[in-house]
From Swiss-Prot:
Pfam families: UPF0180. It comes from Bacillus anthracis. This is UPF0180 protein BA_1413/GBAA_1413/BAS1304. It comes from the Bacteria. Belongs to the UPF0180 family. The lineage of its organism: Bacteria, Bacillati, Bacillota, Bacilli, Bacillales.
Length: 82
């Protein structure tokens, strides 16, 4: 299966990581700002509005805030943004 996109996902969002892997995305766990580099899109919890500085232009793709969204909602947003 061809990798669709490289998605950075905050460490605590394990259900989102699994769902995106099943859809064929390469998933990178975000532990620091450097992990976001090279990602097409990042998913963060939204508990810290600027988690690890990712809201600054450290990635070229979009940042999706998972707060209040289901895993399916997040996967749909990733699909529409990558």
């Amino acid at each position: 299966m061809r990798i669709k996109a490289r998605i950075g996902v905050e460490n605590s969002l394990t259900d989102v990581q699994q769902a995106l892997k099943q859809q064929g995305h390469e998933v990178v766990t975000l532990n620091s700002e450097q992990d976001a580099q090279g990602c097409d899109c990042c998913v963060v919890t939204g508990q810290d509005s600027n988690m690890m500085g990712i809201a600054d232009a450290s990635i070229k793709g979009s940042v999706i805030t998972a707060h209040g969204l289901t895993t399916d909602d997040i996967c749909q947003q990733v699909e529409s943004r990558t």
